[in-house]
């Protein structure tokens, strides 16, 4: 055994599994990059005495670990990674940035049609199809963001949008179904959120009313403050240190 006061395996893959066999088990913290459906995840489910804590990136993921994998609540802690608090000055050149990830094309088409009906200009980014610098430029130039997103265990890109001070109208979803009916659980595309971030709706029939409210109070949102208060590097480090202790 290698002797350390704390042992932290951020990602649990073949390399981490090998490392795991050489460290003190009673101080071992694992996650949040854990996939309980693979061989290494199954090992953690079957050997709960081999680690002190498993980390979930958000509350709904913790609930999934408990309710679908029968992991004890006292074994699971929630820790989101820190988000940079950008010191940007917004340079607005168009109305809406559409952020699209793992949703149906017809939902995207409905949003585009809605924005067209309001004579609003928009640009779109799709997950996996952008570079970091180009993404930040598009975010900084947008008056607001329209989020059409699948479930997120944390939602780092979304939180970077918030951190740049861009209000969001989010077409949220209520369940995680990625692994089929047996693992259906309540979930969300915005696991870190409060009223400072923007507005949320779940059904296309709610869009018109929600959007009217969003536009009427657009200048009152402060997503940058939400990130600073909840997901800054300082907040993230404090939470992690509390878990390690």
Locations of regions flagged by a protein language model:
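Conserved catalytic-core segment of nucleotide-activated headgroup transferases in glycan assembly
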Residues: 81-135
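Short alpha-helical donor nucleotide-sugar binding micro-motif in glycosyltransferases
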Residues: 137-142
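Catalytic binding pocket for nucleotide-activated donors in carbohydrate/polymer assembly enzymes
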Residues: 153-230
């Amino acid at each position: 055994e290698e002797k350390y006061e704390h042992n932290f395996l951020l990602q649990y893959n073949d390399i981490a599994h090998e490392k795991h066999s050489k460290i003190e088990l009673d101080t071992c913290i694992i996650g949040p990059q854990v996939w309980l459906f693979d061989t290494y995840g199954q090992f953690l489910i079957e050997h709960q005495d081999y680690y002190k804590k498993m980390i979930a990136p958000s509350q709904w993921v913790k609930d999934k670990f408990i309710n679908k994998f029968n992991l004890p609540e006292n074994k699971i802690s929630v820790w989101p990674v820190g988000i940079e608090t950008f010191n940007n000055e917004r340079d607005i050149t168009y109305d809406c940035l559409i952020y699209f990830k793992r949703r149906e094309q017809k939902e995207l088409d409905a949003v585009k049609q809605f924005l067209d009906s309001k004579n609003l200009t928009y640009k779109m980014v799709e997950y996996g199809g952008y570079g970091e610098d180009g993404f930040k430029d598009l975010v900084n130039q947008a008056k607001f963001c329209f989020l059409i997103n699948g479930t997120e265990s944390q939602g780092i890109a979304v939180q970077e949008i918030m951190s740049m001070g861009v209000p969001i109208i989010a077409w949220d979803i209520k369940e995680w179904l990625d692994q089929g009916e047996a693992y259906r659980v309540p979930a969300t595309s915005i696991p870190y959120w409060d009223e400072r971030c923007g507005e949320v709706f779940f059904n296309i029939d709610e869009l018109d009313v929600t959007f009217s409210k969003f536009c009427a109070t657009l200048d009152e949102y402060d997503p940058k403050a939400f990130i600073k208060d909840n997901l800054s590097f300082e907040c993230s480090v404090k939470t992690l240190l509390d878990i390690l202790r």
